[in-house]
Amino acid sequence: MIEYLNLKRMTAMHADEIAQAVTGVVNGGRYLQGDATREFEHDYARYIGTRHCIGCGNGLDALTLILRAYIELGRLAEGDEVIVPANTYIASILAVTENRLKPILVEPDITTYNIDANLIEQAITPRTRAVLIVHLYGRCAYTPQIAAICRRHGLLLIEDNAQAHGCRFGDAHTGALGDAAGHSFYPGKNLGALGDAGAVTTDDDSLAATVRAIANYGSHKKYVFDYCGRNSRIDEIQAAVLRVKLRYLDRDNQRRKDIARYYLDHIHNPLVALPADRNNDSVWHIFPIRCNDRDALARHLLQRGIQTLIHYPIAPHRQRCYLAWSHLSLPITEQIHAQELSLPLAPYLSDEECRQVAEAVSDYSPSNGNRP
C-alpha cells in the first residue's frame, strides 16, 4: 500500500539528528522558553526573511494571535471585516471569528485554488480592514495586484503560510510578503514537528512584542500582565526538532517539486484535471487533482494499492459551525470541494512508487472505478 502520508517514513529521513536534538533537550532540563526555542525562532526568521519569529502552540493560534494583537494595537476592532478565501481550511476562518471579526468569503481561482485577486476589490466595504491570503496546497497566493489593493484601501495583508514553508514569490519567501504571517508545523507539513507547533513572522516590532505577550498569558514580564492573554508557546522539543528539519527544507521541497513534475508529465487522463504549473511556484504540500466522480477514482486507486485524501470534503460555509452562511452561493468553492482528490506526495516516496501512482491515475475509467 502506498499510503497518502507515512509520518514514520518522514521522520526516518532525519531520525539520527532528530534523536540527538531531542536527547539534548531532555538532558538539558529546560523544556519551555529555552535555547532551542530562541535558536529556532532566530533561524526561522532568518530563513523567512523577517525581523521577528514568535513560536506558538499551533497554526490556528498563530493566526488568532496576529488578529488579537492587531485589535490590542487599535488596527482592528470587533465587527471589522476580514476578506478570506472561501475554500480554505477552516482554521483560517476560525481565527477570524474567534476574535469577533467578520469573515468575508471570496471565491478562488479554479486553476490555482487560491483567492481570486480579481474578486477582492468588489468585496471591500467601509468595514473591511484586512485581507487574509492562504497559500493553499503549497502554492503562493500573493500577487502584486493584491498588495496594491491593500495599499490603496489601507488594509492589512496577512498570510496563512501553514501549507507553504519554503515557497517563494520572486526572491522573497512566503511568510515575509505581507504585514504578518501565521505558520503551522503540524507533523504532516513540509516543515513538520513531532506534535503541534506554530509561529508568527513579521517585521513589525510592536506587533511582535504584542503577539509574544498575548501568547504568554498576556505578560511581557514575569507576573506582570498587560493583556488578558493565553498560553500558546512552542515547547523546547518541538523547537529542537524543527531546527533540524529546517536545514533540509529546501532539499525536501525540491524532491516534492520533482515528484510533482513527474506526475504532471506522466498522468494522462482526460477525466482528471491536473493542477496548474505556473512558474513552478508551488512547494507541493498537496498535489490536488479534480475528477467529476472523485469517489470512483478514489476507489480505483485504492484497488491499485494507493491511498488518497480529500482536501477538503465540506466547504467552510457548509459546516454546521457556520450554519448562518449556508445560504451563500459559492459555486467555484463547492465545485472544488466536490471534485478534489489529493495524491500521495512526500519527499520519501521512491521513483517506483511515483510511477505506480501516475500509472494508476492514467488507467482510471468510470468502469474500473465502479467495481465493487
Model regions: which residues?
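Helix C-cap/helix->beta junction micro-motif
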Residues: 99, 152-153, 304
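Conserved PLP-anchoring active-site segment centered on the Schiff-base-forming lysine
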Residues: 67-124, 130
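PLP-dependent aminotransferase class I/II
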Residues: 37-42, 47-53, 60, 118, ...
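Active-site phosphate-binding strand-loop segment of PLP-dependent enzymes
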Residues: 111-193, 199-201, 342
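N-terminal "arm"/small-domain region of PLP-dependent enzymes with the aminotransferase-like
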Residues: 1-30, 35, 304, 344
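Phosphate-binding glycine-rich loop
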Residues: 30, 35-81, 95-99, 105
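Pyridoxal 5′-phosphate
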Residues: 16, 76, 256
